[in-house]
Amino acid sequence: MVGGLIALLVVLAAASAAGFAMRRRQGRFRSAEPTPAAPTQAASSGRPAPSPDALSAADLGAPLGAQATLVQFSTQVCAYCGPTRELLTEVARDRDGVAFVEIDAAERMDLTRRLHVLSTPTVLVLDALGGISSRASGPVRRGDLLTAVGAVLDPGGAS
């Protein structure tokens, strides 16, 4: 009886710790795993060629921002997608060269699978070439979003 109670307490403690750890990561941006870019230059722009995992305007169904693009994967039953959309729209509107694109994860399963989107909202911050700079899953915090966007707009300086 006492052994069973101890086992139950251990399981509850482990589950609580796991839940706390997941909650702390939710909505926080993390750097994307970079895929080495081809060393060649993009013919038309003279800039480095985009990485192989970069997203194009054709992938998104909308033009990329001149400096950055905020991409939100949403679903109809997502409780946090509306507030996240409002925040991303505001940040894109207030910063020159930043675009916002919302993608219905259920309608674009090709991208959902390719980018390993497991929950909504998932937010990607893309650079000017469509390379994924960072991503977050869950409700996004304004400060974290501004830091992630700042890292793309001014990669060498403070944001």
Where do the model's predicted regions map?
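Typically the conserved alpha-helix immediately C-terminal to a functionally engaged Cys/Sec
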Residues: G82-D94
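Thiol-based oxidoreductase modules, predominantly thioredoxin-like and allied folds used
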Residues: D96-D110
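Anionic-ligand binding region
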Residues: A49-S51, L55-G61, A66
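The canonical Cys-X-X-Cys-His
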Residues: C78-C81, V123
